[in-house]
Amino acid sequence: MNNRIKEAFAHGKAFIPFITCGDPSLEVTEQIIIEMEKTGANLIELGIPFSDPTAEGPVIQAANIRALSGGVTTDKVFEMVKRVRKVVKVPLVFMTYANVVFSYGIERFAANAAEAGMDGIILPDLSLIHISEP
């Protein structure tokens, strides 16, 4: 199996830009993601907007609020990723909050992320205490 994330770090350093999906719109987000890859991104972090982005600074907090005010939903982000994945080959990783995943449904979120072509997820507010040993 091909591991795009592992390949992104094959040469040690990687350029990893971030964008909040839906700010200013999902259509613009798609174009920005494509340009990020064209300009050398090795991996791209896609922020799923959340109403209480406590781990973010004021700029990304404001981007989350603008995206949500514009009607962005997790389902719409998945649909956008499906479209962009047809042309973007670098790894795509969601950066969002645990509540987004939990309220959506863990299994449903994972299935939709895989179907859309996502390579991973970062949940900065999920404590390791919540992780059980296999």
Please give the residue ranges for each predicted region.
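Short, acidic/polar
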Residues: 27-35, 103-112
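Catalytic beta/alpha-barrel core
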Residues: 70-71, 118-128
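Glycine-rich, proline-tolerant flexible connector loops at the mouths of alpha/beta enzymes
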Residues: 45-72
